[in-house]
């Protein structure tokens, strides 16, 4: 029976076309088919209910309903730089699926043959990146900078074309409790990943957010692992940085909410590799707010935008 299920998974992993959107969460999981229309308008004013982004989005939904799509949805991604074009679209159809079943079937993807990597390039390279870290650390000792967020890219070339559906299965197998996503892009590429962080979920007037700030590496030994989590929770530095994030989010959400609540202290959540400090934010939005206006209000999150 296990063998037949593994064979079934091998067949089904190819059934997610590169042009399909996939989203899996504890609250709703679904895939899409087809593309009725693409929406590339920049989201720079997306939080403004009277702005161009919101008006164009409403017009796109009106056109979809007029074309016979009974319950149109808009899916995709908004770039870090919201002045750049959005990567959103209205699919012709969508359907939900069982998250537990997908978590179970994705376990078999971890046993599939890995792809042959023929080139791996770090951008910037290690020496350059470490020099950037040294310079950033020195700057934080001056009044000019409080904190710096650094990142780098890894450019990988494989011998064969990457099967994004198979790669998604591996991500789910490694991160079954995360928010897993597969976003087709207008240039033919795919954005996919697994994140433990929730920017925004809205149901009716109620909304929820789970920002993360402050992390520690997991340890292979259970005792040391628990100790790493306790140290993170007790860390004055990490608690301070986490509070800067949550208070910044509270400041922008409060004027748009009729109710807003945050716990006094963060909680610990885990991924397979890291401990994180997290705070469950919840509230009730004002009557005219929609999910996109609140999401644009919060995007990019403070930790990503360099604050704190």
Predicted regions and their residues:
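Short Lys/Arg-enriched alpha/beta "domain-start" segment
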Residues: 1-53, 156-161, 165
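Short secondary-structure junction motifs
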Residues: 18, 145-147, 176-180
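An anion-binding catalytic pocket shared by soluble metabolic enzymes
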Residues: 23-39, 157-240, 260
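Short coil/turn segments at secondary-structure boundaries
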Residues: 25, 147-151, 182-185, 265, ...
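Contiguous alpha-helical scaffold segments within structured protein domains
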Residues: 32-33, 41, 96-127, 133-134, ...
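Non-catalytic accessory segments adjacent to catalytic cores
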Residues: 49-157, 162, 258
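A short catalytic or substrate-binding loop motif that flags glycine-/basic-rich loops and adjacent residues
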Residues: 70, 191-193, 307-308
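Conserved hydrophobic/aromatic pocket- or pore-lining residues that grip, position, or stack substrates
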Residues: 143, 200, 247
């Amino acid at each position: 029976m296990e063998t037949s299920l593994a064979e079934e998974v091998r067949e089904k992993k190819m059934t997610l076309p590169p042009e399909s959107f996939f989203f899996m969460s504890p609250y709703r999981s679904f895939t899409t088919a087809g593309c009725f229309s693409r929406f590339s308008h920049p989201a720079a004013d997306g939080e403004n209910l009277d702005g161009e982004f919101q008006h164009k989005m409403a017009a796109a939904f009106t056109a979809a309903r007029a074309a016979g799509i009974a319950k149109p949805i808009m899916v995709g991604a908004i770039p870090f730089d919201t002045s750049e074009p959005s990567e959103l679209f209205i699919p012709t159809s969508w359907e939900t699926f069982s998250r537990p079943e997908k978590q179970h079937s994705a376990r078999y993807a971890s046993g599939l043959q890995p792809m042959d990597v023929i080139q791996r390039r770090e951008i910037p390279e290690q020496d350059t990146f470490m020099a950037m870290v040294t310079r950033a650390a020195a700057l934080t000792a001056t009044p000019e900078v409080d904190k710096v967020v650094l990142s780098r890219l890894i450019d990988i070339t494989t011998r064969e074309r990457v099967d994004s559906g198979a790669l998604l299965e591996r991500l789910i197998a490694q991160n079954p409790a995360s928010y897993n996503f597969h976003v087709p892009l207008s240039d033919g590429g795919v954005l996919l990943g697994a994140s433990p962080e929730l920017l925004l979920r809205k149901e009716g007037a109620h909304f929820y957010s789970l920002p993360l700030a402050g992390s520690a590496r997991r340890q292979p030994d259970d005792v040391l692992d628990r100790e790493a989590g306790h140290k993170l929770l007790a860390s004055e530095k990490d608690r301070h940085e986490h509070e800067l994030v949550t208070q910044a989010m509270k400041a922008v959400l409060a004027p748009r909410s009729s109710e807003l609540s945050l716990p006094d202290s963060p909680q610990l959540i885990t991924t397979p590799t890291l401990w994180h400090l997290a705070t469950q934010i919840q509230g009730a939005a004002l009557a005219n707010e929609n999910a996109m206006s609140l999401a644009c209000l919060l995007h990019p999150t403070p930790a990503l935008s360099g604050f704190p």
